[in-house]
Amino acid sequence: MTVSTIIIKNSGSGNGTQHSFPYGFKIFADGDLDVIVRSSTGTETVKALNTDYVVTNAGIDTGGNVLFKFNTGSSSDAHFSSSDKRPQSGETVLIRRSLDLTQSTDYVANDPFAAEDHETALDRLTFITQEIQEELDRSFKVSRTNTITTPEFTDSATDRASKTLGFD
């Protein structure tokens, strides 16, 4: 597949009854998502796969859904939980692709070239690059012409104590 989108996260609002929240990007496995619920007070809680939610359509280019668990009345239902895990009113759900930084494609000398495996490895690297870019986009940066050569603060922790970061 070609990677034609840079979307790596989706968000939605809870209402206490909605249990399905879509994600619109490819993942390779159910565990390739971070699901975070932010309360109205700003507290963020990372939810656990198979405890708080399940995932649909891993491996599908167009994405799928995160399904929060709740008491469906049938313990054989994949969405069943004895306690309600659905996001409540005032809570925001963030679904973000988060791949392990590993490379599992192994090429064996003199074997036929596995084009599909190669393309999957390239897609995975592109996805990881997109995740890094998303993190960079949320960070403080200095201008390209700045002459700072170290990423560390020049003042000691003692000198920085009780100080405030400010902007003009």
Predicted regions and their residues:
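N-terminal assembly/attachment segments of tailed bacteriophage virion structural proteins
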Residues: 1-122, 131, 135, 149-166
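Extracellular/luminal recognition modules and glycoprotein regions
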Residues: 139-150
